[in-house]
């Protein structure tokens, strides 16, 4: 009978166990707010980003985005990331889109989308639009 070899176990120091991880990127989509009246109503979502990664200008940021800006961001990511499959956004909603449960479902979908794309190593290091979308108060999509 052959003995299976076990990998070597390295002991960690207390400093290593409690030190700040090398790369942190935390993204939350919170606090949806509906604006406007009648046909001009829309909802914005607050994107809170906490990171220590060098590709981001700020360590802590908070910006507001509408769904249409997420769509433009998605399109820009697809154009610049030919080798990476960009996950879909939550679907467009045509009826009852301002109900609390519908807004919450979309918020969760947008948060999952951002966490997926921002967690991809190639997008983190090579995207020209990721940090701008997550951190710039005036996100200006290119046509």
Swiss-Prot record:
UniProt main location, coarse: cytoplasm
Protein's UniProt keywords contain Membrane: yes
BP-aspect Gene Ontology terms: endocytic recycling; intracellular protein transport; late endosome to Golgi transport
Residue ranges constituting the PX domain according to the UniProt record: 23-140
Record SMART domains: PX (SM00312)
Topology versus the membrane: Peripheral membrane protein
Keyword match Membrane: yes
SUPFAM superfamilies in the record: PX domain
UniProt KW keywords: Cytoplasm, Golgi apparatus, Lipid-binding, Membrane, Protein transport, Transport
Gene Ontology cellular-component terms listed: cytosol; early endosome membrane; Golgi membrane; nucleus; retromer complex
GO terms assigned for molecular function: phosphatidylinositol-3-phosphate binding
Binding site residues for a 1,2-diacyl-sn-glycero-3-phospho-(1D-myo-inositol-3-phosphate): 66, 68, 92, 97, 106
Disulfide-bonded cysteines: none
Cellular location(s): Cytoplasm; Golgi apparatus membrane; Prevacuolar compartment membrane
Function: Required for retention of late Golgi membrane proteins. Component of the retrieval machinery that functions by direct interaction with the cytosolic tails of certain TGN membrane proteins during the sorting/budding process at the prevacuolar compartment. Binds phosphatidylinositol 3-phosphate (PtdIns(P3)).
Family designation: Belongs to the sorting nexin family.
Domain notes per entry: The PX domain binds phosphatidylinositol 3-phosphate which is necessary for peripheral membrane localization.
Protein name as catalogued: Sorting nexin-3
Species assigned in the record: Schizosaccharomyces pombe (strain 972 / ATCC 24843) (Fission yeast)
